[in-house]
Design a protein with these regions (language model features):
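A short glycine-rich, Lys/Arg-flanked "PGG" loop and its adjoining helix->strand segment in the class I
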Residues: 77-78, 149-167
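Class I SAM-dependent methyltransferase Rossmann-like catalytic core
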Residues: 26-53, 57
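S-adenosyl-L-methionine
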Residues: 98-124
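Short glycine-dipeptide loop
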Residues: 59, 82-84, 165-171
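Core SAM-dependent methyltransferase catalytic element
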Residues: 205, 220-245
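Conserved Class I S-adenosyl-L-methionine
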Residues: 183-210
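A short acidic, Gly/Pro-enriched loop at the edge of an enzyme's catalytic core
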Residues: 124-138
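Conserved class I S-adenosyl-L-methionine
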Residues: 59-68
């Protein structure tokens, strides 16, 4: 039988691997070039195609909420340059796993319009009506995850996102699909959430669904195993939802 320390370590590693941008090895970044790691992730994350689904324009102000190592922040930064800004947000729980990558990505002002924004989820500290768009990638299920050092006040968190958006601003959600009708049943252990549940919840909070995409759909995913199972890692069935305030 596994010892308690081993069980705790397994739990910590499982949660760590769920963080967007989590990487087991250090990544090298060069100014003016995208990293080999990011280019490798493009194959399955299809970041460039995702950005084509949203109306990013130069000068916009965007938040990459719980943005992990900053894969999307860098893509966004290029689209909204030269005068736009991206806030790459992470909280204390994420930083032990992505902090080195964030620091390397932003070192020596490599991305001049990306601002590191380390804040807890109960105080995101975005100025009211200051954001044109929020990216929330592979993290929505985490607002239903409860652990010793992780519990989010969902209503307050969503309220903060909505308050930070300008009138007509957009919220982009991408997450690992759970079986239809399962709600949040799979959020705790399998890090997935039912698309219909997310749509219903955000509509109740005053958001309007304006676009869906099947860009990241994978019918071979049973949606009943962890996104980090070797058979499905980085190839999960994922939904893409664009909401408007």
């Amino acid at each position: 039988m596994p010892t308690l320390p081993r069980l705790l370590l397994t739990a910590v590693l499982s949660f760590s691997l769920c963080l967007p941008g989590f990487a087991a090895k250090e990544v090298e970044f060069v100014k003016g070039e995208r990293s080999a790691s990011d280019l490798e992730q493009d194959v399955d994350r299809k970041g460039q195609q995702v950005l084509e689904l949203v109306d990013l324009k130069p000068g916009m102000v965007v938040a990459d909420v719980l943005g992990g190592g900053g894969y999307y922040s860098e893509l966004i930064a290029e689209k909204i340059a030269p005068y736009g800004r991206v806030y790459l947000h992470n909280n204390r729980a994420y930083l032990p796993h992505v902090g080195k990558e964030v620091a390397a990505r932003l070192k020596d002002n490599r991305l001049e319009n990306v601002i590191r924004h380390d804040r807890e989820t109960d105080d995101l500290a975005f100025i009211d009506q200051s954001l044109d768009m929020i990216f929330f990638i592979l993290g929505y299920h985490d607002i239903y995850h409860v652990d010793k050092n992780w519990k989010i006040d969902r209503d307050d968190f969503i309220r903060q996102l909505k308050t930070a958006l300008k009138p007509g601003g957009h919220l982009l959600i991408i997450d690992h699909s759970a079986p239809d009708g399962s709600g949040t049943k799979y959020s705790q252990d399998l890090h997935r959430i039912d698309k219909a549940y997310v749509i219903s919840e955000l509509k109740q909070k005053g958001f309007k669904l304006i676009k869906e995409s099947d860009l990241l759909v994978n019918d071979k995913d049973s949606r009943e195993i962890s996104p980090f199972h070797p058979d499905i890692r980085r190839k999960t069935d994922r939904f893409i939802l664009l909401f408007q305030k």
